[in-house]
């Protein structure tokens, strides 16, 4: 397992700190004790706080693990020549999200990616809102990880008084 840390200035996006270090803890083994990972993270948190002269209060994480699961769906709606609105898209995504969670107990959705919009048989990369259409569909990819792994990672940061905003 390797840990990559990047700290960016929130005003200008400039990279302040970046480092990759190796760790023998295998986060892919969700039953393993994560003490070494915890020690490395505590050390890196201290380094980052020293370098930035600020306490870390919250983090956004990217986690790669063989325990992640990817589920793709295509959702279709007959729109009856009405205007396509953001609320229509959000409703479909929320409905799919609930179905995914019901079917995958003990998993957490960490990412929802819309890979394609198809409106009246025309493909779009970006959703054209407020356009009349007969029907539309979305291709969505959900990325999940086990809740137990998510809780272990959050616990490590919580011990250091850091909130995990998003994984």
Briefly describe each language-model feature range.
Residues 6-58, 63-167:
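Nucleotide/phosphate-binding catalytic cleft detector across ATP-hydrolyzing
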Residues 1:
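Two-metal-ion RNase H-like nuclease active-site motif
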């Amino acid at each position: 397992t390797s840990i990559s840390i990047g700290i960016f200035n929130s005003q200008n996006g400039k990279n302040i700190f970046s480092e990759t270090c190796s760790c023998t803890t295998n986060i892919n083994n969700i039953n393993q004790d994560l003490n070494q990972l915890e020690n490395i993270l505590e050390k890196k948190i201290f380094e980052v706080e020293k370098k930035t002269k600020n306490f870390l209060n919250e983090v956004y994480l990217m986690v790669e693990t063989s325990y992640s699961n990817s589920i793709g769906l295509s959702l279709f709606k007959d729109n009856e020549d009405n205007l396509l609105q953001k609320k229509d898209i959000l409703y479909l995504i929320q409905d799919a999200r609930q179905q995914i969670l019901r079917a995958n107990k003990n998993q957490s959705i960490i990412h929802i990616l819309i890979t394609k919009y198809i409106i009246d048989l025309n493909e779009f990369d970006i959703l054209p809102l407020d356009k009349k259409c007969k029907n539309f569909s979305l291709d969505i990819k959900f990325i999940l990880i086990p809740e137990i792994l998510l809780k272990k990672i959050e616990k490590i940061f919580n011990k250091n008084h850091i909130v995990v905003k998003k994984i």
